[in-house]
């Protein structure tokens, strides 16, 4: 199970994110959103989780419980695996963790956005029962809003 990270884990998280999103930068031709912000302030409102050694994570999950209306969904701000861990089931494990965390927070769904230029990522989420809610055009990118319901009425 991932460990809750603190601001003391910032350097390894930043190094991890740079490695994990390096390929996306080349594909998209723009800076990935998770690499374009100052993480220091994010620790005040978001949950950071590390899988693997704290000083050299194999996976990182960043959740924003304040993004959606209370009680509705838990927003995945970032979910990533180290390049050498891809294809080993770690992404599935991290997504399972996110769903458990959403249930623990009494959320009905999990939501996220991804770039339209990453069809293999979109397909992966679709295989995990996410649905596409809408496309949004931003400067230099089109993002895909996705949602997975985890609770029934």
Language model: regions and residue ranges:
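Extreme N-terminal starter segment of soluble prokaryotic enzymes
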Residues: 1-2
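Acetyl-CoA-dependent GNAT
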Residues: 7-84, 95-97, 101, 136-139, ...
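Residue-level marker of the N-terminal boundary of ABC ATPase nucleotide-binding domains
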Residues: 73, 122-124
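Active-site acidic-Proline motif in GNAT/NAT acetyltransferases
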Residues: 81-84, 88, 116-117
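Residues forming the Rossmann-fold NAD(P)(H) cofactor-binding site
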Residues: 92
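Conserved GNAT acetyl-CoA-binding A-motif
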Residues: 102-114
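Conserved beta-strand-loop-alpha-helix junction that forms the acyl-donor binding cleft
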Residues: 112-121, 138-142
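Conserved active-site tyrosine of GNAT-family acetyltransferases
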Residues: 125, 130
């Amino acid at each position: 199970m991932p460990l809750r990270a603190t601001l003391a884990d910032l350097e390894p998280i930043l190094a991890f994110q740079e490695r994990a999103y390096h390929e996306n930068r080349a594909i998209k031709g723009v800076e990935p959103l998770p690499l374009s912000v100052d993480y220091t302030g994010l620790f005040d409102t978001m949950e950071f989780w590390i899988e693997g050694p704290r000083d050299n994570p194999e996976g990182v999950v960043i959740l924003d419980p304040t993004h959606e209306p209370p009680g509705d969904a838990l927003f995945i701000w970032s979910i990533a695996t180290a390049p050498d861990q891809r294809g080993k089931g770690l992404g599935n494990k991290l997504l399972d963790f996110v769903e458990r965390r959403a249930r623990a927070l009494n959320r009905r769904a999990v939501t996220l956005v991804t770039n339209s230029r990453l069809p293999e990522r979109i397909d992966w989420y679709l295989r995990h029962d996410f649905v596409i809610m809408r496309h949004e055009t931003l400067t230099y990118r089109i993002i895909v809003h996705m949602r997975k319901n985890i609770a029934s009425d």
